[in-house]
């Protein structure tokens, strides 16, 4: 979805000689990389062991969306289930991007607002802007602010609603959002490193702390509350 949107955004460059072969190679590499999952799944489906059932639409995507406060939660419980948004967040699994990615996006905005920092690396500024834009789009699609239910109620878009419903859960947009915002945070550090190296070090340390501390808490919570996982097993 986001690859198609990117290609449409830069359609003049998409079909040029250096870009189109690179996109085809990336698509081929993605397919090969996922064969470890696709081949067994197809075998199970052919053998009748696994069947994909259930009809989903955009209304179901809204039901599985995430609150903004939940999206940037720093400390959450280590296990749980994906409840309906109408049931609140109690007992849900950790559905969060974390404060580290939010801080990375904020640092990048500070970088592009400073002309001296922004001009230090045009490539980093351009890549960071693209990843920030698409990353925020993915986060918006996962949030309860996205008008999934309005799309479901729009009769001319029923076919699109059913197609998008195959995603099943809105929080699956967290995967591309995470990868895109990680690149955005790295671009922020790169921009500051060339002009203000001390600020870049402080930003990198802050991002590292905001990543390690919640991860450590998550492991601690899992080891102390789960009956299946103990400290000895780790």
Give short role names for the model-derived ranges.
Residues 12-23, 106-149, 196-199:
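Membrane-interface helix-loop-helix junctions at transmembrane boundaries of multi-pass membrane enzymes
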Residues 4-9, 104-111, 178-193:
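Transmembrane alpha-helical segments
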Residues 156-191:
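Hydrophobic/aromatic-rich transmembrane helices and adjacent perimembrane loops
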Residues 33-50, 68-78, 129-168, 210-227:
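Membrane-interface helix-loop junctions at the exits of transmembrane helices
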Residues 24, 28-32, 132, 136, ...:
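Hydrophobic, lipid-facing residues on alpha-helical transmembrane segments of integral membrane proteins
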Residues 19-116, 127:
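Periplasmic/ER-lumenal interhelical loops and adjacent helix-loop junctions
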Residues 227-234:
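Basic, alpha-helical nucleic-acid-binding regions used in initiation and control of genome expression
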